[in-house]
Each structure stands twice: as C-alpha cells, then as structure tokens.
C-alpha cells in the first residue's frame, strides 16, 4: 500500500542578500513517519523549518501540506492547517503556570475570537485539551508550576505539550535536545517517539545528536550547503560515503 505524502517541497529555494541559503530542495515526507534531518552547522536545516512554518518566504519553489500549496500562507494559517513547531530556543511563557502555557496554545489552534473564548464552554475545552497534553508528556503533576521553574528538559516537554494541544498533523522539532542534560535525554526521546507512534503524528526533527536521530527516525535527510545530499533509511544514510565525507569527514 502506498503511503500518502503529507508534506512536500518542490524546487524550494531561498536567497538572502545574494547568498543561496537553500537550493532546489525536493522532499516528500510520508504521512505518519519520523524523519530526521541532519547536517553540519549552516547547512540550512533550521532555515528549511522556517520556510515550512512561514517565517521565511522562499524565492523559488513551493511547499505543499496534504497536497495543497501553502507557500504564500502566513504562519498562523499553517498552524490552523495542522503544522506545529518547536524552536531551538525555549518559547514558553516563563511567568505563566505550565497549564496556562498549554491552554493558550490550544486556543490559538482553534482560532476562535476572544468573544468565543470568554464563554465558559470554550475555556473548558481548551483547558481539557491542555490537561490531556500535559499528561501525554508526563507533566501533569507540574501543571500548576510557574513554567520558568521547570528544568530545561521539562521545558522541552512543555513545548511539545503546547504543540500537541494545537492538534497538529505534522510536528517540526528544531533541536529538542539542545541544552538538555545527558540524564534527561532518554526520557525526552521516549516522549517524542510516543507522540509519533501513539498519537499518529508525522514528526520531522532537526538534531545534532546523531545517536538520537538514528534511534528514532525511519528515514534521514542530510543537508549540506543548503541542498539535500541524501534522503534514505537510517541504515543507508549512515553507510553513504558522500554523507560521511560531507557531514562527518570519516566513516560512521
């Protein structure tokens, strides 16, 4: 059975100030898969996520979500279509309670007016969604904490809960292990993997920890100088001589 493509780029490119940042990227992401994206610093990985989420406008090509061209749409519209994202730098509201961070994310996804969300039923629906998301990532016991008091690993879990509360079809995780202690990484990896397997989400993850990527990704895309060098199964990518030379400089 052929698996449908949920996210795709066609000849996607971005030039800034005369420099080519992303060039001719053709990528098809399968519905429900876990795709890892690796590459050296400056390869264009985060820029690709910025193009996906609408923070940057490409100079060429297009982006499709579930078969529809979303290239010219603003970030909020892409979110409403089911594209969720976390960032390298923590994006939580540190002075708000953990549960309120997630509830606000749930409200933003549904896109109702303030009038709608002042109604008790609307508030309750968003709160219920927030409580569910916190349970999914193991933060229910810290729902009343001020978000700024969380450990870095728990802040990453909170960001994932905020994305889950928005009920996305596709989740973009930009270096979720950045700043997380070695001891906390395995638990965070399990949370991320469960989101894909149990909740049926499509996950794209940019990550510098190769062992994390190879442990969870079904396929890996390798970027180098703004181009896709390879897209293949984890095993094949790790044995690819071009990847070894361009990314690691030596065999894996």
Residue ranges and their predicted role:
Residues 2-252:
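Glycine-rich phosphate-binding loops of nucleotide-dependent enzymes
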């Amino acid at each position: 059975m052929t698996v449908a493509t949920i996210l795709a780029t066609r000849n996607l490119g971005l030039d800034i100030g005369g420099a080519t940042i992303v060039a001719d990227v053709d990528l098809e992401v399968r519905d429900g898969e876990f795709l890892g994206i690796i590459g050296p610093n400056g390869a264009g990985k985060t820029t690709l996520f910025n193009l996906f989420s609408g923070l940057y406008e490409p100079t060429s090509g297009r982006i499709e979500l579930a078969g529809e061209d979303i290239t010219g749409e603003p970030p909020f519209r892409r979110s409403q279509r089911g594209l969720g994202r976390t960032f390298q730098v923590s994006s939580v509201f540190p002075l708000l309670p953990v549960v309120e961070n997630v509830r606000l994310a749930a409200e933003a996804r549904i896109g109702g007016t303030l009038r709608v969300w002042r109604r008790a039923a609307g508030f309750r629906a968003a709160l219920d969604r927030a409580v569910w998301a916190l349970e999914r990532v193991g933060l229910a016991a810290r729902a009343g904490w001020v978000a700024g008091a969380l450990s870095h690993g728990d802040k990453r879990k909170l960001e994932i809960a905020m994305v889950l509360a928005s009920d996305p079809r596709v989740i973009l995780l930009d270096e979720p292990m950045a700043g997380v202690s070695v001891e906390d990484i395995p638990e965070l990896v399990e949370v991320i993997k469960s989101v894909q397997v149990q909740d049926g989400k499509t996950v794209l993850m940019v990550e510098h920890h190769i062992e994390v990527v190879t442990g969870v990704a079904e396929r890996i895309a390798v970027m180098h100088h703004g181009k896709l060098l390879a897209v293949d199964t984890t095993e094949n990518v790790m044995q690819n001589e071009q990847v070894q030379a361009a990314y690691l400089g030596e065999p894996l």
